[in-house]
């Protein structure tokens, strides 16, 4: 695969627009505030899911009203990429302008949705090949492409591309999946750093699903129409299925790669509820 690794001096994540402050603790519980370029979010927080850019059955005015006061919603990278397509969203100035939402957004990487397409996908070292659930077209999603899509969407928080294994797989299979996720995490970070620094520009509309596109060799200026001086934040994802030793190892090694924040992935994917709660408590 083509290397997207920028010079060593620029590999580390530059200052993002994200800050987190813990304001109170009680036992393992914490209350805090996340500061983004689009306002503050008190935690813990409920994040409504806007799969295709809208939260079903409720208007944004209601989400923003005092009784709900939703400060962040989630956009689904996989679904937005396939329909309406990134070219359409880019032409509107990014996802916020496309949907008319002025508060913070988090976009997932597409990994979970691809996992759900068990019968029509193929996972390789390069990424995931799958059939669109819309028209059956052959598509290809990789760490690099996921980062390009999320950069173009312009969310405040992007997620690294990961493999989401079933919750009840055996230890050997879970380790193979975890190792792949860790390699993809490194590639996600390298691509994200390059994109945010303007070293790569999303080549939107140039053969999505036809394989990995080549990195641009010449430096590029920062992308126009950005969301401020500070860049999009990138979160790493902890995997390891239901095996606590793998979860702990995944946590340590993902932190070593270095992200702005960390998510616990691969929960509620077939494991028993007590196992899920044990993983959350342990991590």
Tell me what each language-model feature is:
Residues 46, 118, 134, 212-218, ...:
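Residue-level recognition of conserved structural "scaffold" positions that shape functional pockets
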Residues 2, 195, 233-235, 239-283:
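Glycine-rich phosphate/ribose-binding loops and adjacent secondary-structure elements
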Residues 2, 16-198:
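Non-catalytic, usually N-terminal nucleic-acid engagement modules in DNA/RNA processing proteins
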Residues 40, 51, 76, 86, ...:
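Gly/Ser/Thr-rich helix-start
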Residues 69, 146, 202, 218-219, ...:
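Generic detector of short, well-ordered, non-transmembrane alpha-helical segments enriched
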Residues 1-15, 194-231:
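Intrinsic disorder/low-complexity segments
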Residues 154, 227, 258:
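Conserved functional loop/turn residues at catalytic and ligand-binding sites
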